[in-house]
Design a protein with these regions (language model features):
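Beta/alpha (TIM)-barrel catalytic core signal, keyed to glycine-rich beta->alpha loops juxtaposed to Asp/Glu
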Residues: 1-158
Length: 158
C-alpha cells in the first residue's frame, strides 16, 4: 500500500477489523502512522470498541470508519427503530430513527459513518443526519438504554 501511495495510485490507505492488539502492532511499524483509518462495525448495538479501540484511535488522531452504523435497523433483532428513547429523540429533531443512529455514530467528529442506501431518499436523509447535534441529555438517555461497555469486548463482525 505504501508503494501504491508513493506512486500516486492511492491517496491513503487503511485497515479493517483491527482490534487494539492489531492496531498496537501496526502503529509500532515505521509505516504504521501512515494508516488513515480502521474500518470496524460500530453502532448502538455494537459499542464494544468504545471501551479501548476508540480512545486509542483518538489518541493517534485516526478516525474510526464505522460500517453498519444503523445496525441494519430491525433486521438484527435489536429493534432499534422501535426503541422508545430513540423514537422520542427522533421526534425532538423531526428526524427518523435511522438519522438519530447516524447522528449518534458521528457525534464526536472522530467517526466516519458509511451507511448503506438503497435509494436517493435514503441518501438525502443520511446526509441530513450530519446536521443533528445530539445534546448531552440525549446522549445520557441513549447511554441508559445502550450503555458503553465497562470491559474490553471482542470486535463485532458481520
Amino acid at each position: 500500500m505504501e508503494q501504491a501511495k508513493m506512486e500516486g495510485k492511492i491517496k491513503s490507505w487503511g485497515v479493517s477489523n483491527f482490534d487494539v492488539n492489531d492496531m498496537t502492532k501496526l502503529l509500532k511499524l515505521p509505516i504504521g502512522q501512515h494508516c488513515a483509518t480502521n474500518q470496524v462495525r460500530y453502532n448502538l448495538g455494537d459499542r464494544g470498541i468504545d471501551y479501548d479501540l476508540v480512545p486509542m484511535m483518538n489518541e493517534n488522531s485516526m478516525p474510526v470508519m464505522a460500517y453498519a452504523p444503523v445496525a441494519r435497523g430491525d433486521r438484527l433483532g435489536s429493534d432499534l427503530t422501535k426503541q422508545k428513547v430513540l423514537q422520542g429523540i427522533s421526534k425532538k429533531y423531526n428526524a427518523d430513527v435511522f438519522q438519530i443512529l447516524l447522528a449518534w455514530c458521528i457525534r464526536n467528529g472522530q467517526t466516519i459513518a458509511i451507511p448503506q442506501s438503497s435509494n436517493a431518499k435514503h441518501v438525502i436523509n443520511n446526509v441530513k443526519a450530519a446536521d443533528i447535534q445530539l445534546t448531552e441529555e440525549d446522549l445520557v438517555k441513549i447511554n441508559t438504554v445502550y450503555p458503553k461497555p465497562s470491559v474490553s469486548e471482542p470486535l463485532a463482525l458481520w
